[in-house]
A protein has these predicted regions:
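His/Asp/Glu-enriched short active-site or ligand-binding loop at hydrolase and phosphoryl-transfer sites
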Residues: 177-179, 183-218, 251-263
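Acidic-and-aromatic substrate-binding clefts and catalytic sites of carbohydrate-active enzymes
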Residues: 83-87, 106-116, 139-145, 172-180, ...
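CE4/NodB-like, metal-dependent polysaccharide N-deacetylase domain
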Residues: 93-106, 127-128, 146-177, 184-189, ...
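N-terminal pre-catalytic segment of deacetylase/amide-hydrolase enzymes
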Residues: 2-78, 86-94, 98, 243-244, ...
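Active-site beta->alpha N-cap acidic-glycine motif
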Residues: 53-141, 152-155, 159
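Catalytic grooves of carbohydrate-active enzymes
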Residues: 216-261
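Aromatic/hydrophobic pocket-lining residues that form the small-molecule binding cavity
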Residues: 89, 115, 149, 153, ...
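A cross-domain feature marking catalytic cores of carbohydrate-active enzymes
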Residues: 81-83, 107-109, 131-133, 173-175, ...
Length: 283
């Protein structure tokens, strides 16, 4: 599987936020010195919030570029499935085959190492892989330091590469959180961060129909759809099938991006090349 260069968003300046952090703290010090704590303290809180809030915004590009929507070639969406491989993976693959759909599976390194045959099944059925961290530390991913973050991304990348034979080129943050130390690791491994534009919150305990309704409301050509497998609530297979049915009912198809020929617009797997279109939204 190759990656279209027009979609590849490797961070070029992973520390670009640092000068702004230093300037903001200098402004806080000067304000505190000039006007006292009544001005300095609120300014300090605001300056810290400015750098903390983007960590929790899945499609924020404050710390790293993000691909949140594809160019809109007629009739296609990008289906992405997180948190595998799991015991449900074969059933997910059967559903995708039934609806003639392709997906990118964002896999957790530890789980891939425990079920390498599932990873190979995904590839053998014509789907793609993405890096979704090695241990999926969802409660503390947002506060991992540089060494721990680098290790999470590196170990997953090495594990998936060892099983698949080729390195993944896509990355998705755990719960979409991206702190200042994600971008350096992405640059190191040549990874593009992928967000989403259609999400139903199926990774946690949920009402399946409510999840499907939320996703369907956001379905449009070029959408990046976020789904999960193997969640404890046991509804993922039903949700995936309902979303696949909705995609077909809307006259859409789930397909993977391919590398275009030189100077050509990136086609879609199973589709044909089309005229040049604007670059993807990266927000």
């Amino acid at each position: 599987m190759t990656v279209p260069e027009t979609l590849h968003r490797i961070p070029r300046r992973p520390w670009r936020w640092l000068p702004w952090l230093l300037l903001s703290q200098l402004a806080v010090v000067l304000a505190w010195w000039a006007w006292g704590w009544a001005i300095g303290l609120p300014l300090m809180v605001a300056s810290h919030a400015l750098f903390l809030v983007p960590v929790f915004l899945p499609n924020s590009r404050f710390y790293a570029p993000v691909l949140s929507h594809l160019p809109a070639p007629a009739g296609h969406v990008w289906l992405t499935i997180d948190d595998g491989p799991s015991e449900e993976t074969p059933a997910v693959l059967d559903l995708l085959d039934r609806y003639q759909a392709k997906a990118t599976f964002f896999m957790v390194g530890e789980r891939a190492a425990a079920r390498p045959e599932r990873v190979r099944q995904v590839l053998a059925r014509g789907h793609d892989l993405g890096n979704h961290s090695h241990r999926h530390p969802q409660t503390r991913f947002w506060r991992l330091g540089p060494a721990a973050m680098a290790d999470e991304i590196a170990q997953c990348q090495q594990t998936l590469t060892g099983i698949a034979g080729t390195p993944p080129r896509w990355y998705r943050s755990v719960v979409g959180m991206t702190n200042p130390f994600v971008a350096p690791a992405l640059k190191r491994w040549g990874l593009t961060r992928v967000g989403w534009s259609a999400r139903g919150f199926d990774g946690v305990d949920c009402q399946p129909q409510a999840v499907v309704d939320r996703i369907v409301a956001q379905l449009r050509p070029g959408a990046i759809v976020l789904l999960h497998e193997g969640a404890a609530h046991g509804h993922n297979l039903a949700i995936i099938e309902a979303v696949l049915q909705a995609i077909q009912a809307r006259g859409l198809s789930a397909a993977l991006p391919l590398r275009p020929l030189s100077g050509a617009h990136p086609p879609i797997a199973g589709g044909s090349s089309s005229p040049a279109t604007p670059a993807p939204t990266t927000r």
